[in-house]
């Protein structure tokens, strides 16, 4: 009679009581790469929107070494006195993640949030046109310096907005049941609506 190893016995016991499986999960490999958020989930991102802010993109990237990124595309409108500022921004938040069986947990690397200003309108006009009018006659160097100053100030405002709206979530470790099937990543958390993401195709890929 073939002698059972301790591992075999343990696996058998786990299977009998329904606590586990000896088949190794492939999630840690399947999850690698870039994922694009399903548009329908963008309306239900409680901690990324609200007020005058709207989320138009919500993507993930998982690298080797338990590091990754969450990329958020967001528009927001700010009003101060007689000026209205419309911003379209990209927010990149690095994450540290862990895969365990069919589960995924992650936390934000809150000190490494990056903000890029993609578009800025002041009272409906491109901010560079507004700056050019204000520094007219002062030369190209003055114009570039003023544009850089405005951009940096806007980044600071957006970073403050991000930390204000998701400050508490940045401190939390999130856990999800995760699965990858047919190039679709699904994240489930209790009774909440599942989040679904499609694997990002390489730029050179073409449809068959």
Regions found by a protein language model. Name each.
Residues 95, 101-103, 161-208:
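Edge beta-strand at a domain terminus
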Residues 47-122:
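N-terminal glycine/threonine-rich, aromatic-flanked beta-hairpin/loop signature
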């Amino acid at each position: 009679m073939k002698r059972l190893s301790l591992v075999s016995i343990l696996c058998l016991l786990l299977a009998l009581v329904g606590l586990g499986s000896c088949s190794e999960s492939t999630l840690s490999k399947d999850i690698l790469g870039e994922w694009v958020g399903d548009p329908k989930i963008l309306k239900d991102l409680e901690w990324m929107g609200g007020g005058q802010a709207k989320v138009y993109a919500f993507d993930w990237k998982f690298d080797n070494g338990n590091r990754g990124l969450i990329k958020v595309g967001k528009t927001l409108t700010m009003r101060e006195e007689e000026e209205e500022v419309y911003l379209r921004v990209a927010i990149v938040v690095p994450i540290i993640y862990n895969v365990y069986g069919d589960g995924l947990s992650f936390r934000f690397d809150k000190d490494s949030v990056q903000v890029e200003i993609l578009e800025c309108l002041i009272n409906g006009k491109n901010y560079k046109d507004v700056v050019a009018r204000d520094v007219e006659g002062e030369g190209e160097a003055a114009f570039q310096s003023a544009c850089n100053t405005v951009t940096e100030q806007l980044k600071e405002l957006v970073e403050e907005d991000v930390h204000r709206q998701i400050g508490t979530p940045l401190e939390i470790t999130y856990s999800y049941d995760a699965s990858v099937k047919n190039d679709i990543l699904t994240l489930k958390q209790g009774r909440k609506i599942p989040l679904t993401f499609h694997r990002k195709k390489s730029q050179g890929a073409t449809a068959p």
